[in-house]
């Protein structure tokens, strides 16, 4: 490929061209043809799409708080990348989403789910898979037609920005875990196994030299089981507390402390969204895209609580975690979990949130006011998600009730148990 410089243009033409008008001359034999292009884009899409579901399923099982937050952000950012690739792929292939024909890549992604522990998962993801994806995207960015395929280049450039940021944020956390002796031999064996699987697939691109034979699964492999309980790391000291009556709203200071302490526990909502997302893989892509955003919104709300508490010299790790709420929700079908969360928790919070905005304004507490207003904006969107997707979730579940009847029945359970704190948890 040869770049056309201004000096090479006919006299006077350079002054008539904007920078966006200057394109690169491309020799067809040097660039990816459109068939190779779409196969590669679909591989990248598949890797990140499958990665989203893996992260969603693992979220409740991961104990380390910082890793929970980062994996949630990765999931959301990966959803943005998959969506950009979806918009491009639907223009150059039909259907837009296709299972890759390379069984080696499919196997590598299937196996990612069965890591022995959270550190095995993160080593495999952030030290093997993501670096391989970055290498593939870097190569693709300059290998395709820079003008004819600019939509792909645009998507790749933005994905690279996020993916590099993920590694920059995660590597210090993994290094800290190594120094603390938290990374087991099983986790390291898992990293090696996934590295060998990816090598057998020729890397994420499939264009690298492939190893001669696939590795055998290591003894550390643990068949993934859907998590029905949420985990927290050793810094959390109050895991099973019951929800208590908050100080009255007329006690502004006391109530506000409890208000933001409750925000700090919204990881529970993110974990429920992740569980729902994992359990309904047949839902349309747009549902997965919306739930990825919903999930990370709840993590941001949790972090909002942490920020507020630390700013007021409080330790968020001593806050009650109410883990039994996740356990209670997880015993219901995913559609009911989603209904109770969006039509119960989210809808019924608005009158209270608006009162809190007014209270913070009257007290001159700008930070608290702004935090709650952003929360209201997010939760308004979550209710829209619920109204959009509950009909399809009910349909796919095979339930014959109408949306109205299903919602009424789900909210009856929510009011009788969640609102009263009398949670009935079935123990098998």
Predicted regions and their residues:
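Non-heme di-metal
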Residues: 2-428
């Amino acid at each position: 490929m040869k770049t056309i410089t201004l000096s090479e243009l006919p006299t006077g033409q350079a002054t008539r061209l904007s920078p966006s008008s200057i394109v690169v001359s491309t020799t067809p034999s040097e660039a990816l043809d459109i068939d190779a292009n779409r196969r590669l884009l679909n591989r990248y899409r598949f890797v990140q799409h499958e990665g989203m579901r893996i992260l969603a399923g693992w979220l409740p099982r991961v104990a380390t708080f910082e890793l929970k937050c980062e994996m949630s952000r990765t999931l959301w950012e990966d959803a943005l990348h998959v969506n950009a690739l979806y918009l491009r792929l639907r223009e150059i292939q039909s259907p837009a989403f296709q299972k890759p024909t390379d069984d080696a890549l499919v196997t590598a992604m299937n196996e990612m789910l069965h890591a022995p522990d959270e550190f095995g998962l993160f080593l495999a993801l952030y030290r093997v898979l993501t670096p391989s994806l970055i290498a593939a995207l870097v190569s693709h960015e300059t290998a395709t037609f820079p003008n004819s395929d600019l939509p792909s280049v645009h998507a790749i450039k933005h994905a690279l920005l996020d993916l590099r940021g993920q590694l920059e944020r995660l590597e210090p956390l993994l290094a800290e875990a190594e120094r603390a002796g938290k990374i087991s031999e099983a986790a390291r064996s898992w990293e090696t196994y996934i590295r060998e699987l990816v090598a057998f697939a020729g890397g994420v691109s499939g264009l690298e030299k492939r190893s001669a034979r696939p590795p055998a699964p290591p003894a550390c492999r643990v068949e993934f089981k859907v998590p029905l309980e949420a985990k927290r790391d050793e810094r959390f000291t109050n895991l099973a507390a019951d929800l208590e009556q908050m100080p009255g709203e007329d006690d502004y200071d006391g109530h506000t402390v409890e208000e933001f302490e409750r925000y700090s526990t919204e990881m529970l909502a993110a974990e429920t969204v992740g569980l729902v997302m994992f359990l309904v893989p047949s839902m349309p892509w747009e549902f997965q895209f919306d739930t990825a955003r919903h999930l990370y919104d709840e993590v941001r709300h949790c972090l909002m609580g942490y920020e507020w508490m630390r700013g007021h010299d409080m330790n968020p790790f001593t806050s009650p975690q109410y883990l039994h709420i996740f356990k209670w929700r997880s015993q219901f079908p995913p559609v009911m979990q989603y209904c109770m969360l969006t039509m119960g928790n989210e809808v019924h919070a608005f009158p209270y949130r608006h009162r809190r905005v007014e209270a913070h304004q009257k007290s001159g507490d700008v930070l608290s006011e702004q935090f709650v207003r952003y929360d209201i904006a997010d939760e308004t969107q979550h209710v829209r998600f619920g109204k959009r997707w509950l009909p399809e979730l009910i349909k796919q579940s095979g339930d014959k009730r109408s949306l109205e009847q299903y919602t009424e029945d789900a909210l009856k359970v929510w009011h009788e148990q969640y609102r009263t704190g009398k949670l009935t948890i079935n123990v098998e």
